[in-house]
């Protein structure tokens, strides 16, 4: 967790207290009856599921803040807003299907939300949305936005690296990087109304994860 780390722990404490209070009498060898294995397992499952729901809720609340900030950043530019939301959705799906570690999943999702943040400045300064300008201008804009939301510098630096390289395909060396590129391709191929031939080229040259390749095959009817 790279944002509001203490919030989850604070919310979990009541359940931790409940867990201890609930099991103390059951497992006591004195006045209370001894719990059966089935009872203990059932109660532990309830407790674990509650903690997991809290963790998911905490992550979603954090992601929502970044999404809202990006929508405010793009304002009435509905095309850019819809684009980053689609890339985020694909990236999240691929990352979860590929069983990314939690820190990598968080890095992937936040990077997907802000990956095109440099496009606004690029169009203003260079009258172009070319990838090279996005990579040039994006990291600084991403740093400002994430710092304002309270993210740690080490995490921001990792996001900025992906933002500054998401149109560079020659040296993809991490799974978050790979999945971000694949998610962006899935959306761009659709938005550009690309042919199946173009999708097949991307399949051969870009896509490496099983989930990403499968999604591309389904969407573009690749045999």
What are these regions (language model features)?
Residues 7-12, 16, 24, 28, ...:
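Short hydrophobic alpha-helical segments enriched in small aliphatic residues
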Residues 20-34, 53-55:
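Short Gly/Ser/Thr- and charged-rich N-terminal loops/segments
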Residues 42-60:
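Short, Lys/Arg-enriched N-terminal segments with co-localized hydrophobic residues
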Residues 63-86, 118-128:
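Active-site flanking loop/helix segments enriched in acidic
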Residues 72-101, 114, 151, 166-223:
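Divalent metal-dependent phosphate-bond-processing catalytic cores, especially two-metal-ion Mg2+/Mn2+ enzymes
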Residues 87, 132-148:
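An active-site-proximal "capping" alpha-helix that borders the catalytic cofactor pocket
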Residues 105-124, 138, 160-167:
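His-Asp-centered metal-binding catalytic motifs of divalent-metal-dependent phosphohydrolases/nucleases
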